[in-house]
Amino acid sequence: MTSDEKSATRDIYDPNTLPDYDREFIEPDDLRQFEKALNAPEAAPLVALNDWRPVNQRVRKSRRTKPRRSKDETREGVLYTVLKWPFLFTVFAWITVLGFAYTLTRLYIFLYEQFVTWRGKREQLRRELSMQTNYQDWLKAAQALDTYLGNLKWKETDEYAYYDHLTINKVVAQLKQTRKAAEMEMQNGRPGLSDPPAVEELCFLLEACVKNNFAGVENPRLYSETYSGTKDLVQEYIDEVHSCIRLVLDSKQISNEDKYQFFKHLDTNFGRTALCLSGGATFAYYHFGVIRALLDNDVLPEIITGTSGGALVAALVATRTDEELKQLLVPALAHRIRACHEGFTTWVRRWWRTGARFDTLDWARQCSWFCRGSTTFREAYERTGRILNVSCVPSDPHSPTILANYLTSPDCVIWSAVLASAAVPGILNPVVLMTKKRDGTLAPYSFGHKWKDGSLRTDIPIKALNLHFNVNFTIVSQVNPHINLFFFNSRGSVGRPVTHRKGRGWRGGFLGSAIEQYIKLDMNKWLRVLRHLELLPRPLGQDWSEIWLQKFSGTITIWPKSIPSDFYHILSDPSPERLARMLHVGKQSAFPKIQFIKNRLKIENAIMQGLQQCSSGGGRVMSPILSRRRQDRAQEHADRMVERLDQSFPERQSDYKDESHYAEVSDSLSATSSRPHTPDARRSSMFEEMRRQSAVFFDDPDMYADEDAVTT
């Protein structure tokens, strides 16, 4: 090791090299406001029986102190009462038997792969692959392993059952031909002015093929047969589409307005990519390595969501620039992770007194450094351009979850959302979300309601991301320990092909994979039966079935490989050496997915660059769906302002009605002179007028959303 390498190694363990290491971002007043909101009594509705009965009537205190289930959860009937607990114990006993059988099956598959498939030269190449610390060296080792296993022949063959190779061949040929014709016109001019330019035909072709998973080119199976890359035809298609998009962007034969509309269509059809970081207590520190691998290869998506421990990592990423992240994601970061610094006697006394192991105010102080103080979701987006999303679950089991971001809660303070997303019952009590007012002070958000761990219901909020940001391609970094135990891809995963029969077989043979799938599906079935029959108890007032039954994977799922000691340190701060290992493992788990992500973002970034260059402002441009959502919100706010003015000044309404009457008479006279009488048009205009009038009393912007979607 040279002197420069030794110096670099010392630097990554030196906490003084971290940006803002000694800086405390949060203000003491912010913590005092947060403490005040936590200690505030729960708001209770005031209801009087009638005009002469007092509101706060003194009633006799109930003798019952033990909490009971609410009325709507109580099941009537003799059979339910008699059979509930015997059936519950029987199912749990059967699940225990299935769990033991599943453990034996996984042990058999592990031994089969270790002693039957991984031997000799291939085992040596695989060990070299796992020792690489950067993507370039890893890619060379992966290509060497593919060459030894004979995977290059699979890349050269176009036919494959999981995508339409005939369609892709035709599209590539047409794109090449049209692109060359457009390039000739750009150099030599158009031969005939009456014919449409070739670049317009190229736009029509791109609008037809630039779609999410067009003809199956984004099927993960296309990247699961080799350690590096995919089919040569698929790679050729990706490169050709990118070249054509660049040509349209540079063309002078299309106006900027037409280009902007063109890229809006492509963005809507192609969608966006999001990085989803799961929860998992201190297992979430594996996310740091995943982030570092994506950052070093320029494939870190702009949309990031995190839950529980993943929310802390996502907040760090969304509030820092790329240069700051490269300095922060090193082993020295462990010196700033102090959430579990208290001793055994301290947290035991707190748990006995409050029901929570950790102190909420101390966690708020520690968490604020990762969020740059009381930064809001909007401020983070304006600083870095990244869209942060945090899943929060209300303490009330019947209320819906929220996905906090700069659209749904722009002024919400990030560290309060991170604490709420990490508030596991028994670990941290439910917390109040805080919002930043115009004067910079903090106040309770959402009427002071309390929130808790988002992993309990929505660890990976795929539906909400699609609703708000048109996300249809998700990169999930999954580190939940109770899910990792059951992770198994019988046919391999992206960049991790099956070792059996040169990647064409099943892990552990077909019989081993079949038994594994059957046992896992049977356990899942019985858990669903218990949930739908409402037989599961609710410890700490929470339905815990969703921590097993929700979807935990995405289009690409990254599973960092944990070790047994991680379970022992599940609620303890990492040392620099332990964090260095987690960074290495996280990067290693992300390397096989880099090429797939590069191909996806290659087209997506080209589309977003086209939107940015062709927009009138020329600045940062959000997706058209996001801009439309902002416009709708601004219009709704303006409509409510007009309504308040009308209520305050009645004479304004009468003047407006008179003016609108004269305008309608004038429009009707001009309409009768220019076009024939159309009863259908008049009927529709009458319904439109009724709808506008009803909106004054029923101001619901979603009332006619479906009708507008059909008519547009």
UniProtKB/Swiss-Prot annotation:
It is found in: Membrane. Its EC number is 3.1.1.-. Residues 667-676 have a biased composition (Polar residues). The chain crosses the membrane at residues 85-105. It holds the Pfam family DUF3336. Residues 1-20, 628-688 are annotated as: Disordered. It comes from the Eukaryota. Residues 275-466 form the PNPLA domain. InterPro entries: Acyl_Trfase/lysoPLipase (IPR016035), NTE (IPR050301), PNPLA_dom (IPR002641), Triacylglycerol_lipase_N (IPR021771). It is a single-pass membrane protein. A motif (GXSXG) lies at residues 306-310. Residues 1-13, 632-646, 652-664, 677-688 have a biased composition (Basic and acidic residues). Its main location: membrane. The active site is at 308 (nucleophile), 453 (proton acceptor). One of its GO terms (molecular function) is triacylglycerol lipase activity. One of its GO terms (cellular component) is lipid droplet. GO terms for biological process: cellular detoxification; lipid catabolic process; triglyceride mobilization. PANTHER family: NEUROPATHY TARGET ESTERASE/SWISS CHEESE D.MELANOGASTER (PTHR14226), TRIACYLGLYCEROL LIPASE PTL2 (PTHR14226:SF66). This is Patatin-like phospholipase domain-containing protein AFUA_1G04970. It comes from Aspergillus fumigatus (strain ATCC MYA-4609 / CBS 101355 / FGSC A1100 / Af293).
